[in-house]
Amino acid sequence: MDSNTVSSFQDILMRMSKMQLGSSSEDLNGMITQFESLKLYRDSLGEAVMRVGDLHSLQSRNGKWREQLSQKFEEIRWLIEEVRHRLKITENSFEQITFMQALQLLLEVEQEIRTFSFQLI
């Protein structure tokens, strides 16, 4: 993962953790956890693509990697919808900027994971 994407993840996670969204703080914590999980998954897929012959070890380590990939895409879609919803309802400019950047990052990561997965198939 390039340094811009790493810093984008770190920046968004830090800013999201500082937000106080009232009764929805549990939802926000869930989003933060999923962002972190998505980052780790994206990193591991990227590393797998870089290693020669890693498709076979990936398949042997996890026979259900396609199912796992499908689950990650579902998580991304859920996060995109959740971020869009938050963006629509918030009036705080700090939160709007954070959620717009989070949405952009999610769309970029979704595309990167698609690219990696096609290389592994």
UniProtKB/Swiss-Prot annotation:
Gene Ontology CC terms: host cell nucleus; virion component
Motif Nuclear export signal: chain residues: 12-21, 85-94
Compartments in which it is found: Virion; Host nucleus
The entry's keywords: Host nucleus, Host-virus interaction, Transport, Virion
Record keyword Cell membrane present: no
Domain of life: Viruses
GO biological process, one term: exit of virus from host cell nucleus through nuclear pore
Listed InterPro entries: Flu_NS2
Broad class of where this protein is predominantly found: virion
Record function comment: Mediates the nuclear export of encapsidated genomic RNAs (ribonucleoproteins, RNPs). Acts as an adapter between viral RNPs complexes and the nuclear export machinery of the cell. Possesses no intrinsic RNA-binding activity, but includes a C-terminal M1-binding domain. This domain is believed to allow recognition of RNPs bound to the protein M1.
Subunit: Interacts with protein M1. May interact with host nucleoporin RAB/HRB and exportin XPO1/CRM1.
Family the UniProt entry places it in: Belongs to the influenza viruses NEP family.
Additional notes on this entry: Average number present in a viral particle is estimated to be 130-200 molecules.
Protein's recorded name: Nuclear export protein
Protein's gene: NS
